Amino acid sequence: MTATPTERWSDVLMGNYGVPPVTFVRGSGTELFDDAGNRYLDFLCGLAVTGLGHAHPRVAAALADQASTLLHVSNLFITEPQLEVAERLDRLIRSGTGSEANPAGGSGRILFQNSGAEANEAALKLARKFHGRGRHGVVAAFRSFHGRTMATLAATGQPEKHEPFQPIPEGFRHAAWNDLAAVEAALSPEVGAILLEPL
């Protein structure tokens, strides 16, 4: 007898969210299809990875074109697409949205990352580097989720997620969402950053 996808999954993959109940085989736009032919509306979007939908012809063509030209060389080297995206992001940031220009003016620096956790880790490191020793504290929101690395887990405002990994890094405090007074109460001279992900 042939093992089911669920059985095969259980044999080789770690169940950080338990055993997945569905095996998806393809997607189209906002829809997913499982191995039994059932159709689902994809509200999760691969945790925001597939926000443009599944199998979008222009996205698929751009990926295929880039993969057939140059797949990846790390950030130790320059590629033209990397420059084009960074320059475009820089222009958008400097111009602001609508009639509002960036009040900071000038150009920043773009740092590409592989995941949200890695981006948050970089933000935490940049805050520490900017402020130096003594201002390493971070205020984040209760019930937030910032990633699975140790620092982003500490920033995550869900104590039940901290427990299996104690001791977690220190210096993180949490305040209620939509409560400016609670955020202000959490501030102190050692706080160097506020980490909020509203989307």
Give the residues covered by each predicted segment.
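Active-site core of PLP-dependent enzymes with the aminotransferase class I/II
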Residues: L199
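Electropositive phosphate-/nucleotide-binding environments in soluble metabolic enzymes
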Residues: A3, V22, R26, G53-P57, ...
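A secondary-structure boundary/capping signal
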Residues: S28, F43-C45, A141
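PLP-dependent aspartate aminotransferase-fold enzymes
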Residues: D90-L196
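Residue-level recognition of short loop/turn positions
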Residues: D35-A36
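Glycine-centered loop/turn positions within well-structured domains
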Residues: T30, L47-T50, A181
